[in-house]
């Protein structure tokens, strides 16, 4: 039977070992040339990483904005208004429109008592109904346009990942090195900040707002039962993943960070 190779975890953190190794190299003959070479490599790594990060962010963003503004939205708007008699994408959108109209009707009814002269309520309701219909018609067009534009952005991001594989490897190495170079207290602070934002005590409300925005962004029905189930289960799943990652990976990479993290939360 073949023995399984396991990664040995020493008592000394790897960051200290890397620092000691660099210090040892600086004492060797030709250390000046070595320092210059390391500086050039570091500068090249920073330049490539910044370019790669900018490309990953702005290329899909520009494709989304340009395709949506000049191609997708005009086409969707023409097809929707010419070949579609409906205004709403789903019943939840229609209920929101009726709720808005009902609120306006109550406001007109209240104003008719507090003002001496009030225009005809039927005329106001008719104008408001037309305005609400226009707004929700535009919301439906916007939701369908978002679906196609975001799909194109995802495709463009996938193509960028395929074309920039070497640069992405350098970017990952640069980000890892930058993260490992932080102090244990700073890394623990960022870890606590991330976990509290995603799975903390006040995170359910944030997940509700995010899920509501996401459903409206794509014109999907806002099912309260689904939202409650998602908010009740997804943060728990994320919390389990975080704890497993801390125990399985971070404890090997930087045990001092894990120790500092536990001291802070205690």
From Swiss-Prot:
One of its GO terms (biological process) is potassium ion transport. It comes from the Eukaryota. One of its GO terms (cellular component) is chloroplast inner membrane. It holds the Pfam family CemA. Keywords: Antiport, Chloroplast, Hydrogen ion transport, Ion transport, Membrane, Plastid, Plastid inner membrane, Potassium, Potassium transport, Transmembrane, Transmembrane helix, Transport. It is a multi-pass membrane protein. Its main location: plastid. One of its GO terms (molecular function) is antiporter activity. Contributes to K(+)/H(+) antiport activity by supporting proton efflux to control proton extrusion and homeostasis in chloroplasts in a light-dependent manner to modulate photosynthesis. Prevents excessive induction of non-photochemical quenching (NPQ) under continuous-light conditions. Indirectly promotes efficient inorganic carbon uptake into chloroplasts. This is Potassium/proton antiporter CemA. It comes from Chlorella vulgaris. The lineage of its organism: Eukaryota, Viridiplantae, Chlorophyta, core chlorophytes, Trebouxiophyceae.
